Curated annotation (Swiss-Prot):
Cellular localization per UniProt: Mitochondrion
Pfam families: Ribosomal_S3_C (PF00189)
Biological source species: Marchantia polymorpha (Common liverwort)
SUPFAM superfamilies: Prokaryotic type KH domain (KH-domain type II) (SSF54814), Ribosomal protein S3 C-terminal domain (SSF54821)
Any single GO BP term: translation
Cellular component GO terms held in the UniProt record: mitochondrion; ribonucleoprotein complex; ribosome
Gene name in the database record: RPS3
Official protein name in the record: Small ribosomal subunit protein uS3m
Family classification: Belongs to the universal ribosomal protein uS3 family.
InterPro entries membership: KH_sf_prok-type (IPR009019), Ribosomal_S3_C_sf (IPR036419), Ribosomal_uS3_C (IPR001351), Ribosomal_uS3_CS (IPR018280), Ribosomal_uS3m_plant (IPR044954)
Highest rank taxon of the organism: Eukaryota
Lineage: Eukaryota, Viridiplantae, Streptophyta, Embryophyta, Marchantiophyta
Length: 430
């Protein structure tokens, strides 16, 4: 019977924690509905289609507190996964460390605290700052040399060292200019980063914000905004609107009178048209978009919502990422057996993976009759409840119909010294 149920559900509170947690029985239905909306929103952000790498979501952990919501988003790093080679590119970079209750140093690095007697954290999350809720160790190791050239080396400054490890830090404008001038392309890449989808999602936010304020009849002027996008629109929108001043009216020579544009609809259309073609690549614009997305969730749920993104360096750290990669390859008309051989070849290089099982159902390779194929490598015993198993399923749209993909990944419970760990254990934060 263990093979017929979700392996995650039968292992909850054993070696797997829940993706969602809240402390309310009365608002159970409301919070469950919010979780479904949050996950649907993150899943709809630039899905991998065609030659587009897209936004690969590994896992989304949501914690609901009274008037406060924490969302931890684990996503695949675009820079560490080649779009052309796909599963064949396993980078030699440091992976995200395992988060458990055995090491005090790791708990301090990620800012997550163990459970206490009454099943809640000893320290209140509201005491911590927004940027210190979830700290990932060594994720910015590749750009360490850039910040060393900007900041003088000081071993005693812990705050400066911690700022380099934040996924989103509040850098000064001078630092942004230096980073953009020196290693902008090498650090952030061209497209497919966590906020590479900003060109479209940034537009979706202001569309929803526009209709929300229009419904409530609140004066909404996109020009009054600190965003560099809004400032650019404010400058360009006055082109062609200037009227030469007349000397009869007592104005000085060289001045101009601008026509007022207080219409809500006209301002929003100009702003959205400009934001449609804008693509945010700098760290400041991505940080600004993250804050706007948090503001959108906070307004809709009437709670203070905080989003903390965490990068995943390898696709084999999550079954969801493997399933998305297989689905993407199948949509590109790749052979299922060829995909499995490529995965099994790279699994040997991952010391934290114990085994993997892949199942695909449908009209494979255009077969007239649908069938199910299952390939496995290593040990994936579903009857042993003590095994640490991650499970995911997805669909692939092909010209012959929809193919269903299921992935089971088994990880080692103990990790050798000097090797990286899978993110399946990093979920023990509740």
């Amino acid at each position: 019977m263990a093979q017929k149920v979700n392996p995650i559900s039968v292992r909850l509170n054993l070696n797997r924690s829940s993706d969602s947690s809240w402390f309310s029985d009365y608002y159970y239905g409301k919070l469950l509905y919010q979780d479904l909306n949050f996950r649907d929103y993150f899943g709809s952000i630039r899905p991998p289609t065609g030659n587009t790498f897209g936004f690969r979501l590994g896992r989304c952990i949501i914690h609901h507190f009274p008037k406060r919501t924490f969302i931890h988003v684990f996503f695949l790093d675009r820079l560490s996964q080649s779009r052309h080679q796909g599963l064949g590119a396993i980078p030699s970079v440091k992976l995200i460390r395992r988060i458990n209750d055995n090491t005090v140093k790791q708990r301090n690095e990620v800012g997550i605290w163990p459970k206490k007697r009454y099943e809640y954290h000893d320290r209140l999350p509201s005491i911590q700052k927004i940027d210190q809720l979830l700290r990932v160790s060594d994720w910015m190791a590749d750009i360490h040399s850039t910040f060393q050239s900007i900041w003088p080396k000081d071993e005693n400054d812990d705050r400066r060292a911690s700022e380099e490890r934040y996924a989103f830090s509040r850098f000064a404008p001078s630092i942004l200019v230096a980073v953009r001038a020196e290693k902008k392309k090498a650090i952030f890449g061209s497209e497919g980063d966590f906020f590479g989808f900003t060109g479209r999602a940034f537009l979706d936010y202001f569309v929803m914000q526009y209709f929300f304020n229009l419904k409530n009849q609140i004066q909404f002027d996109p020009m009054v905004n600190r965003s560099p996008v809004a400032q650019g629109v404010a400058k360009t929108s006055m082109i062609g609107k200037a009227i030469p001043a007349k000397t009869e009216q007592g104005t000085q020579s060289g001045e101009s009178i601008c026509q007022p544009r207080s219409t809500l609809y006209f301002d929003a259309i100009i702003f959205l048209r400009y934001a449609r073609f804008r693509k945010a690549t700098s760290l400041s614009s991505r940080y600004y978009y993250l804050k706007k997305m948090q503001s959108l969730f906070s307004n809709q749920t009437k709670t203070n919502t905080l989003i903390q993104p965490v990068k995943i360096a390898s696709v084999y750290q999550s079954a969801s990422l493997i399933a998305q990669e297989i689905s993407w390859k199948l949509e590109q008309k790749k052979s299922f057996r060829q995909i499995c051989r490529s995965i099994f070849k790279q699994i040997k290089k991952c010391p934290y993976v114990k085994g993997i099982r892949i199942g695909c159902s449908g009209r494979l390779n255009g077969a007239e009759i649908a069938k199910t194929e299952c390939k496995k490598y290593g040990e994936t015993s579903l009857h042993v409840f003590s095994d640490q198993i991650d499970y995911a399923k997805t669909q692939a749209s092909t010209p012959y119909g929809i193919l269903g993909v299921k992935v089971w990944v088994s990880y080692f419970l103990t990790q050798k010294k000097g090797t990286s760990c899978a993110i399946s254990k990093t979920y023990k934060i509740s």
